[in-house]
């Protein structure tokens, strides 16, 4: 065979691989999207019901407790939803190392769960709303424990995303059905958290048993657990700090003002975060492949980064514009009478969608796969602190709009900072291109 024939053969093989790879990526993203939409739409059907049954004050109390629970989830996950996925994506062909990672991550998560117990006790002592409504705190903690121990990272790292995604969606469906059956009056709000905690517990128990059926079972170890916590600490700082301007906004707002204001802001934020979460399946489909390619094929990883910007960035701009224009209709349908003041809050928060879309591309799909956790985490810590400071300055005067302004400022700081970091590392924004000499930075 001549050299030109060899070149043509190699080119044909590369094209064939590229088509198969893109087909698999598209298939994973599509399946994840279906599962995610199922898991999102069904509980989202409960929002109009809960907003009306619980009224703004009761709905605000529920969102306050959910917000605290979701922040506890970040503590228990300790960044392993990203660092664990990244590690598994790189060693998935090595059964021995895979078993060691599973053993280490599970040990670390159990330790992190134990750390949340004093945090929860402190919240009960220090927060009047929790002292007056202990059932909300208890079930919020139990939900966090179940969700935080999820072994999704193991399956996602091997690009086996579909079954776990549908299992979680199924748990949400069951919880949503329970809401319609068991939540009838404003005092029943805690039952929403209880149903979510029980549904998630069943799903996570099944997935954990599935994971351990594929790897050797090893008893959790304090020493190994602390070692894994140390290895994932930089991503945990990023995750925990980002929670201060993502998951914990309703909780922060509830510390400053009354539950009714939390209900107005939280209702608008729930709508906009629901839209933003539709970007998650795409990000989950790209992340393990980009992490794998960043080590083995940087050229392919660069192409994937551009592809993720087109899809994630493009969709986020469309969704942001749509949510701004449709805000009055969305509030009327999803929240109902008594929530009219949430319309301008929702319109302001619609700016978050494209900001977070761009930030996701340069943060999750570039900074983490290439090992830039430290500068990324630094930006997120700064944004989390800024969000808290602005919240305490703006909320007493502007209420929910003050909280919205605080969140937007924090998210914009992260997105702009990541773009600057990308340029400083030799990247190009147009056309999007990573530095040709860029290497992986391990921490």
Locations of regions flagged by a protein language model:
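Interhelical loop/hinge segments that connect adjacent transmembrane helices in multipass membrane
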Residues: 2-25, 189-190, 205-246, 285, ...
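Signature of the first transmembrane helix
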Residues: 3, 23-81, 176, 233-260, ...
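Transmembrane helical elements of multi-pass membrane transporters/channels
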Residues: 27-44, 164, 170-175, 192-207, ...
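Membrane-interface junctions at transmembrane-helix termini in multi-pass inner-membrane proteins
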Residues: 134, 144-167, 353-380
């Amino acid at each position: 065979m001549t050299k030109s024939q060899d070149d043509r053969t190699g080119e044909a093989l590369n094209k064939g691989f590229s088509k198969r790879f893109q087909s698999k990526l598209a298939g994973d993203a599509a399946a994840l999207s279906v599962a995610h939409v199922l898991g999102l739409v069904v509980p989202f059907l409960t929002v109009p019901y809960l907003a009306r049954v619980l009224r703004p004050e009761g709905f605000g109390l529920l969102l306050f407790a959910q917000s605290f629970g979701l922040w506890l989830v970040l503590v228990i996950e300790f960044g392993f939803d990203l660092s664990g996925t990244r590690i598994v994506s790189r060693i998935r062909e090595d059964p021995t190392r895979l078993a060691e990672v599973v053993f280490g991550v599970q040990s670390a998560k159990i330790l992190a769960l134990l750390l949340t117990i004093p945090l929860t006790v402190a919240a009960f002592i220090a927060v009047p709303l929790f002292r007056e409504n202990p059932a909300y705190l208890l079930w919020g903690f139990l939900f966090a424990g179940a969700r935080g121990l999820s072994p999704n990272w193991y399956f996602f790292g091997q690009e086996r995303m579909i079954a776990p995604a549908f299992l979680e969606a199924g748990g949400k469906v069951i919880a949503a059905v329970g809401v319609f059956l068991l939540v009838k009056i404003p005092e029943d709000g805690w039952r929403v958290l209880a149903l979510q905690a029980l549904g998630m517990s069943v799903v996570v128990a099944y997935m954990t048993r599935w994971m351990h059926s594929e790897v050797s079972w090893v008893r959790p170890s304090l020493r190994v657990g602390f070692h894994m916590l140390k290895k994932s600490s930089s991503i945990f700082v990023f995750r925990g700090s980002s929670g201060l301007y993502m998951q914990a906004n309703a909780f922060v707002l509830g510390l400053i003002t009354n539950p009714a204001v939390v209900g107005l802001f939280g209702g608008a934020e729930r709508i906009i975060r629901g839209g933003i979460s539709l970007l998650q399946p795409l990000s989950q489909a790209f992340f393990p492949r980009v992490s794998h390619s960043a080590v083995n094929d940087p050229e392919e990883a660069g192409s994937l980064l551009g592809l993720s910007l087109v899809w994630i960035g493009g969709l986020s701009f469309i969704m942001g514009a749509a949510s701004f224009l449709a805000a009055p209709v969305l509030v009327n349908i999803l929240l109902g009478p008594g929530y009219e003041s949430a319309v301008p809050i929702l319109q302001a928060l619609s700016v978050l969608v494209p900001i977070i879309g761009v930030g996701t591309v340069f943060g999750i799909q570039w900074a983490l796969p290439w090992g830039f956790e430290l500068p990324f985490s630094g930006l997120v810590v700064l944004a989390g602190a800024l969000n808290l400071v602005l919240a305490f300055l703006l909320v007493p005067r502007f209420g929910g709009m003050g909280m919205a302004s605080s969140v937007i400022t924090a998210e914009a700081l992260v997105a702009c900072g990541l773009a600057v970091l990308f340029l400083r590392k030799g990247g190009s924004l147009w056309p999007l291109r990573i530095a040709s000499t860029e290497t992986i930075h391990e921490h």
